[in-house]
Amino acid sequence: MPPRRKRVSSAPRRRRRTYRRTTAHKHQERPVHRRRRRRH
């Protein structure tokens, strides 16, 4: 049984960086993100 990684600590930090830094790249890959950003 491999040790479980703690994603709770990294999740919030990675989400904020991805949204701001890879905005263009994100909506190019998944259009869903673009719709969510517009509603936000």
From Swiss-Prot:
Protein function: Protamines substitute for histones in the chromatin of sperm during the haploid phase of spermatogenesis. They compact sperm DNA into a highly condensed, stable and inactive complex.
UniProt KW keywords: Chromosome, Developmental protein, Differentiation, DNA condensation, DNA-binding, Nucleosome core, Nucleus, Spermatogenesis
Tissues expressed in: Testis.
Region entry Disordered, spans: 1-40
Gene name tied to this protein: PBP2
Native source species: Bufo japonicus
Gene Ontology MF: a single term: DNA binding
Protein name: Protamine-2
GO process terms (BP): cell differentiation; chromosome condensation; spermatogenesis
Gene Ontology cellular-component terms listed: nucleosome; nucleus
Statement: the UniProt record of this protein carries the keyword Nucleus: yes
Subcellular location: Nucleus; Chromosome
